Amino acid sequence: MSDPIKTRTQGHVLEVTIDRPKANAIDLATSRIMGDVFQSFRDDPNLRVAILTAASEKFFCPGWDLKAASDGDAVDGDYGVGGFGGLQELRDMNKPVICAVNGICCGGGLEIALSCDIILAADHATFALPEIRSGTVADAASIKLPKRIPYHIAMEMLLTGRWLDAEEAHRWGMVNHVHPADDLMSKAWEMADLLASGPPLVYAAIKEVVRDAEDAKFQDALNRITGRQLRTVDVLYGSEDMMEGFNAFAEKRDPVWTGR
């Protein structure tokens, strides 16, 4: 059996591809592999950006593997580090993750996409949370989706399970950009290369600030930032990269980021 998760690196970018028959559904073993992959990415100082995509032209990911569940995988089983799909609960993921959705993205697959920082979609991609139709709750999406798109659109998706095509998902802000299917991965790499050329310490600080602010009142969050109470912000202030950014601007040249 081939590996369900394939990876390749180029420069500072890691590409992660879900490749499971028949629709890239995720079982416990695959989730644990994804967790290990993203944890290694998080902890590798040479890697700055990740792209998550899937091998099929029809399916990105439908979420939980129902066949595996019927064969004995427990819904509350060991998903591995990072929870389902390796990203949703991975602590301190302070590097940008791009999701390149190349087909049907629903249920837990959409929850994984929502755990990424930027979502690009092929023009034929579709999105849904169909759990309601099987009498279950899209647990992580119930928390995340109303924070990502207008509340009433999120509630319609959660309450009815209706599908959005790529253009509508883009219109509501769920998707950053829609591309022809043949261009999706080249556009994802273009975005990844752009981010990989940027300042990693600033990215880390931005991601921690955003995470912290989601559960804090604005003033409390602002005080935590300005008081340098967040580890990544404290590391950023006074770093070589921060000074390099100032110097490069003053000298009208491109900065050289070192992550120090």
PLM regions with names:
Residues 1-11, 44-45, 57, 161, ...:
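C-terminal alpha-helix plus adjacent terminal tail
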